[in-house]
Amino acid sequence: MIRIGMVVAEFNYDITMMMLERARSYAEFLGVEVHKILRVPGSFDMPLAIKKLLMDNDIDGVVTIGAVIKGETDHHKIIMDNVSRKITDLSLEYNKPVALGISGPGESRLQAEARIDMAKEAVESCVKMIKLLKSN
């Protein structure tokens, strides 16, 4: 059985918790076990939690869940640039997929709400990559 971990940002909690529920339901639909869920303050805080999950031999891959909504400055771009880069680095370092389920940057709250299903897409991406890596 495939076992995944999830890292969820609490910032924009109303959106990320809906994303988490969709992701968990979809993982169950796919027959995938969600082994651990770690909650972090915001998307910028994810890399350390991702690393902790990747170090666990019982976890095949990690799904990230967050919503980076545009504010009055370019802070949202800095967050996404750094988090996405570090997520890729960790995936390559541990040879396990880390799926980007963080919506943004540059989106409004309304757009973030419309993109809640992005969490399901991240689960699907993670599972596909796990299967690919296990088959070769």
UniProtKB/Swiss-Prot annotation:
Keyword annotations from UniProtKB, A to Z: Riboflavin biosynthesis, Transferase
Segments forming a coiled coil: none
Residues noted as binding (2S)-2-hydroxy-3-oxobutyl phosphate in the record, renumbered to the chain: E72, T73, R115
Known catalytic reactions: (2S)-2-hydroxy-3-oxobutyl phosphate + 5-amino-6-(D-ribitylamino)uracil = 6,7-dimethyl-8-(1-D-ribityl)lumazine + phosphate + 2 H2O + H(+)
GO cellular component: riboflavin synthase complex
EC number of the protein: 2.5.1.78
Main EC class the enzyme belongs to: transferase
Record-level GO BP terms: riboflavin biosynthetic process
Similarity comment text for this entry: Belongs to the DMRL synthase family.
Official protein name in the record: 6,7-dimethyl-8-ribityllumazine synthase
